[in-house]
A protein has these predicted regions:
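Mobile genetic element proteins and their domesticated derivatives, centered on retroelements
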Residues: 1, 17, 21, 52, ...
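RNase H-like two-metal-ion nuclease catalytic core shared by retroviral integrases
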Residues: 40-41, 127-129, 135-136, 149-171, ...
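C-terminal domain-tail junction helix/linker
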Residues: 139, 143-147, 169-211
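Basic, flexible linker segments flanking DNA-binding modules
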Residues: 1-60, 156, 211
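Short small-residue beta-strand/loop micro-motif enriched in glycine and branched aliphatics
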Residues: 89-95, 150-152, 176-177
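Conserved, non-catalytic sequence blocks in retroelement Pol enzymes and Pol-derived host proteins
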Residues: 6-9, 56-58, 74-75, 129, ...
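Active-site beta-loop-alpha junctions of metal-dependent nucleic acid enzymes
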Residues: 96-118
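An active-site-proximal beta-strand-loop segment
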Residues: 58-93, 99
Length: 211
């Protein structure tokens, strides 16, 4: 009973205090500790419907974007790649790489994409239901720029297949059959490949015509 000792200079064990409280029908005040909210927890109220329904084609640029975060892993070391592509031609609009999978990674990617494309009002931005995409920060950025949020159904990667396939292609062509010696070396290779993809590998609007 540390409180009694500090406040009144009285030393008394817990059992004696309990007997006295029972005798006089006293109740101890119990302060419930508030449960800490996981900062990486999905906010259910911010989950949006799937507006694409697996229709991943569009006839004009800057109408539908697809985004996701993926792992870059090399010998136990890990980084995270956040990417936004335009579904018109599958071109990478913006990307960011970080050692931390947090809201900042996604917001930096989104803000850069908006800065590059300027007028994005009326755009649909599609993603999965990851915690960054259901965050209030993500919602606020989209709403303030006239962007409509669309989300794949929970646990359904095929609903977000363009960006999933793009990340798979990137890993296939960078991680395998290359003399990578460190995660930092891998990240450099990823950045070089993205530049190559956007300038050389991409086939423009033919991508959409094939689908």
């Amino acid at each position: 009973m540390e409180g009694l000792k500090i406040k009144y200079g009285v030393v008394m064990n817990g059992k004696k205090v309990l007997r006295i409280m029972r005798k006089y029908n006293l109740m101890a005040e119990y302060i419930r500790k508030s449960k800490k909210k996981n900062k990486n927890e999905r906010i259910e109220d911010n989950v949006k419907p799937n507006l694409l329904n697996r229709n991943f084609t569009t006839d004009v640029p800057n109408k539908v974007w697809d985004t996701d975060v993926t792992y870059l892993i090399f010998k136990g070391s890990r980084a995270y790649l956040s990417t936004i592509i335009d579904l018109y031609d599958r071109k990478v609009i913006s990307y960011k790489i970080s050692k931390h999978n947090d809201n900042k990674l996604v917001m930096d990617t989104l803000n850069e994409a908006i800065s590059k494309r300027k007028d994005v009002s009326g755009l649909i931005l599609h993603s999965d239901q990851g915690f960054q995409y259901t965050s209030y920060e993500y919602k606020a950025i989209c709403e303030s720029n006239g962007i409509t949020i669309s989300m794949a159904r929970k646990g359904t990667p095929i609903d977000d297949s363009p960006i999933e396939s793009w990340h798979s292609l990137l890993k296939k062509e960078t991680l395998y059959n290359n003399n990578i010696t460190s995660l930092e070396n891998y990240i450099i290779l990823v950045e070089e490949w993205i530049k190559f993809y956007n300038t050389t590998r991409i086939k423009g609007k033919k991508v959409n015509k094939k689908r």
